[in-house]
């Protein structure tokens, strides 16, 4: 699914899922890195994010895969 990843003012990250009109904060990263990792959102979803360069400019829309969550 297409998601938009943004950097928040406080230093964290959030994800917007346009298909679901959902915005959620990333609360945990499996490998302590954003790209090529599994992100857990504050609503319980887990998304597998693509492996992109560390310095990718945000916000960016990417194809993510949902692994778990309602």
Per-segment meaning from a language model:
Residues 33-46, 51:
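Acidic, low-complexity, intrinsically disordered interaction modules
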Residues 14, 51-70:
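Short, surface-exposed, low-complexity cationic segments
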Residues 20-23, 27-39, 69:
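Exposed regions on extracellular, virion, or secretory-pathway luminal proteins
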Residues 6-11, 31-35, 53-54:
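Short, ordered beta-strand-loop transition motifs
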Residues 4, 38-40, 56, 61:
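Residue-identity detector for threonine
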Residues 1-28:
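N-terminal acidic leader/helix
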